[in-house]
Structures are given as C-alpha cells and as structure tokens.
A protein has these predicted regions:
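Sec-dependent N-terminal signal peptides
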Residues: 2-10
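Carbohydrate-interacting regions of secretory-pathway proteins
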Residues: 12-236
C-alpha cells in the first residue's frame, strides 16, 4: 500500500516524461519576438497577395491592395491562403468601413475561416446589435465572445488566435474537437472554446474527417472590409 501511494505521488508530481528541472530536456527554439516573430509565415505584408488565391477557382486573388492593407472587392469572392495549416497561432488586423452602413449582419461583415471550415466572425459590432453568436469575436453560430471590446467604424482592430484542429480516428470518427482561444484588441474573448463542429448559418453540421492541413480563408460578404499585418505560426 505504501509503495502504491508513493508511486501515485511520483506520477502526480512529474506527469510529463521528463523529470522536473532536467537539464537534458530539449530546449525551446529561440525566436525573435518582434512583429512578426521570426518563425512566423507572413501571409500579407502590405505589398501583394502572392500568398493568396481566389477560393472559387484558385486563380490570383482579386482583392485590392493599397496603402499597406488589402480591401475586399465585393463580388470577387472569398480569398484562401496558398498553403494549408492545422494547429496555428494567427495574428490579423482588420477594419470595418469608416462610414457605417446597414444594421446587424449587414454592417461590416466578413469572416476568418480557420482551415476554411471554422469561422471567427468579423463584424462592425460597435453600437450595432445582432444575435450574440454572430457578433465580432464569436465562433460563428456557436459561442458569443466573453465581452465586446470592439472599436468604432474605420479603426484598426487586432485578433490574436490560438487554434487547435480537430483530431479524427482512423475510421473517421471524432477523437478530439477543435479548440479556439481569441484575443480581440488584447482582451480575451474566447477561452479555449471547444467547437461542436464546422460553423454554419442556422444549422449545426457534425464533424467530418478532413485533412490535417487546409487553407485559411477570408470571406467576401459584400462589404469593403480591410485587413493588414497577417502572419501565422504553425504549432505542429
């Protein structure tokens, strides 16, 4: 009994494979923390859309680049990254039109789709009422943000996202759901939220097995939204 308790205590004290304070444990990689970190992939540097494609047909992205930002050209379609990603840290800055037009979901609407499937809502949510799971910072249709720290129309705002993709078993069944943590303008708004499946409008589709890496997508929802300083770090 004493031996059993001792072994239990040891397993609780050192739950990982390395002994506490082991000098043999692999060191974390050293990165420059400047904007962006030195190990980040810059998806948009304010100059061109070489890292992006049209989602519809994989042709060159058709949004407008000017003055260090890219602006949605309504009607040209959603834009997808040229490469795929799974677990990531994402930084992206966005701004709604300076002159607010429309109400609810019609005002400054776009979306950031992790793996092209899991949407983090982009919306002008400054003094603009809509359903809570559709406002800025919501995991669309699933979870409202914890708080609303949005700025007024035309002001630059920033998302910092930690996303962990879902894991699937060999038979296609779900092993672990996707998880998302989000800061908006430095304020925590999604705290390791477990997604119940792909995001969708007025429906809740189940998880379906998909590749471990898929493109990031930025949505054309008919509003001239702006984005800048987009970088991403692979976490796997």
């Amino acid at each position: 009994m004493i031996v059993t308790l001792a072994l239990m205590a040891m397993s609780q004290a050192t739950p990982q494979q390395w002994p506490q304070h082991s000098m043999d444990r692999p060191r974390p990689a050293v990165v420059n923390p400047g904007p962006p970190p030195s190990d980040a992939i810059v998806l948009f540097d304010g100059k061109d859309l070489s890292q992006w494609r049209s989602d519809a047909d994989s042709s060159a992205a058709k949004w407008t680049v000017r003055d260090g930002y890219v602006e949605v050209k309504p009607g040209t379609g959603t834009m997808a990254s040229a490469r795929g990603f799974g677990d990531v840290q994402l930084h992206i800055e966005w701004a709604t039109p300076a002159v607010a037009k429309g109400e609810g979901q019609e005002r400054g609407n776009s979306g950031i789709f992790l793996m092209g499937i899991y949407e983090l809502q982009v919306l002008d949510s400054y003094q603009n009422d809509t359903y809570p799971d559709g406002q800025a910072g919501a995991v669309y249709g699933q979870n409202p943000p914890l708080v609303n720290p949005t700025k007024g129309p035309g002001q630059w705002q920033a998302y910092d996202v930690i996303f962990h993709r879902p894991r699937f078993n060999a038979d296609g069944s779900l092993d672990k759901p996707a998880r998302m943590t989000v800061l908006l303008n430095g304020v925590l708004i999604q705290d390791n939220f477990e997604l119940v499946g792909p995001t969708a409008n007025r429906q809740q589709p189940p998880y379906r097995m998909h590749p471990d890496k898929l493109p990031l997508k930025l949505q054309d929802h008919g509003n001239p939204m702006r984005f800048r300083n987009i970088w991403i770090r692979a976490l796997e």
